[in-house]
Amino acid sequence: MLNFVRIFLPFLKYQVFTDKTNDLLKYNIYVFDVDKKLNKLQIKNIIEYIFNIKIYSINTYIKNNKYCCFNKIKGLKTNYKRAFIRLKSVNIIPYFSC
């Protein structure tokens, strides 16, 4: 199990903590930024295995690139995939619940 977590944990970047996402915790919806290459089934398998929970549904979207300037260099910020994970009513993620 430890090898599985060590391999797939970098794909799960971090949980998003904003005012809107904290309001979603009341409805048992958690928001994570994940690797862009993962699909819904892979996200589901990783989270179910790491946290030992059952997932009801997953919604994802990819944020658009944003232009940024640093001194005279113009470039694009990297885009990422955001996953909204709804759990079954009896499950919670103990480290991220409100």
Curated annotation (Swiss-Prot):
It comes from the Eukaryota. Its main location: plastid. Pfam families: Ribosomal_L23. The keyword Cell cycle does not apply. Keywords: Plastid, Ribonucleoprotein, Ribosomal protein, RNA-binding, rRNA-binding. SUPFAM superfamilies: Ribosomal proteins S24e, L23 and L15e (SSF54189). GO terms for biological process: translation. It is found in: Plastid. One of its GO terms (molecular function) is rRNA binding. GO terms for cellular component: plastid; ribonucleoprotein complex; ribosome. The keyword Nucleotidyltransferase does not apply. InterPro entries: Nucleotide-bd_a/b_plait_sf, Ribosomal_uL23-like, Ribosomal_uL23/eL15/eS24_sf, Ribosomal_uL23_CS. Part of the 50S ribosomal subunit. Binds to 23S rRNA. HAMAP family: Ribosomal_uL23_B. Belongs to the universal ribosomal protein uL23 family. This is Large ribosomal subunit protein uL23c. It comes from Euglena longa. The lineage of its organism: Eukaryota, Discoba, Euglenozoa, Euglenida, Spirocuta.
